[in-house]
Amino acid sequence: MSQYQEIAKQGLWHNNPGLVQLLGLCPLLAVTATVTNALGLGFATLLVLVGSNMLVSLVRDYVPKEIRIPVFVMIIAALVTSVQLLINAYAYGLYLSLGIFLPLIVTNCVIIGRAEAFASRNNLAHSAFDGLMMGIGFTCVLVVLGAGRELLGQGTLFEGADLLLGDWAKALVMQVWQVDTPFLLALLPPGAFIGMGLLIAGKNVIDARLKARQPKTQAEPVARVRITKVS
């Protein structure tokens, strides 16, 4: 198995930032009331992850170890500011919807964790790919959780997609079933905690079943060595 395949498996499943590392839970639980918000935050996090991993990998040999964390945070903050200005300019409605959680990407442990644990120790290509896979894995968790909460709470999917993609995206909105009164438990933070717990439980069940299907290797018996004298 190549290193790229291993990085992809780690980011998407085995070491998923949301389901395994349980990092970035604050924005993950707060803004996933709709698929649109989940996609917007996931896209922003993905851009920052890839950019920060690349820049940290480039400067890793020039930054003293004693000040590496402040330097990494400054790099991440610069990228987050750039992404924030980009969303403010081209998706203002989404910018208002995400609110404070957009600049708080700076403190997201997923990003600083990958910068410290991976990008600071690997080359540019591997670091960029790691950021991409971790970002996609985190975004997938956001989207699945957002879809479940929106579907249960409002009976819709892609509500407000025009905030992210423009007026043409209004055609993407799907009314799966008619909801007279929104199911507030799904839309509020308690529903996010319950949904996240179900996702983690589902992953654990899948992992357990996959492990059970693997052929069990039987250890070879070890021959005993006689240590007593024979008279």
Swiss-Prot record:
Pfam families named among the record's database cross-references: Rnf-Nqr (PF02508)
HAMAP family: RsxE_RnfE
Localization in the cell: Cell inner membrane
Keywords recorded for this protein, A-Z: Cell inner membrane, Cell membrane, Electron transport, Membrane, Translocase, Transmembrane, Transmembrane helix, Transport
GO BP, sorted A to Z: electron transport chain
Coiled-coil regions listed: none
Subunit structure, interactors included: The complex is composed of six subunits: RnfA, RnfB, RnfC, RnfD, RnfE and RnfG.
Signal peptide interval: none
One cellular component (GO) term of this entry: plasma membrane
Membrane topology classification: Multi-pass membrane protein
Source organism: Shewanella denitrificans (strain OS217 / ATCC BAA-1090 / DSM 15013)
Transmembrane domains' residue ranges: 18-38, 39-59, 69-89, 93-113, 128-148, 182-202
EC number of the protein: 7.-.-.-
Function: Part of a membrane-bound complex that couples electron transfer with translocation of ions across the membrane.
Keyword Transcription: no
Keyword Transcription regulation found: no
Protein name: Ion-translocating oxidoreductase complex subunit E
Primary localisation category: membrane
Gene this protein is translated from: rnfE
EC top class named in words: translocase
Higher taxonomy: Bacteria, Pseudomonadati, Pseudomonadota, Gammaproteobacteria, Alteromonadales
Family label: Belongs to the NqrDE/RnfAE family.
InterPro entries, per database record: NqrDE/RnfAE, RnfE
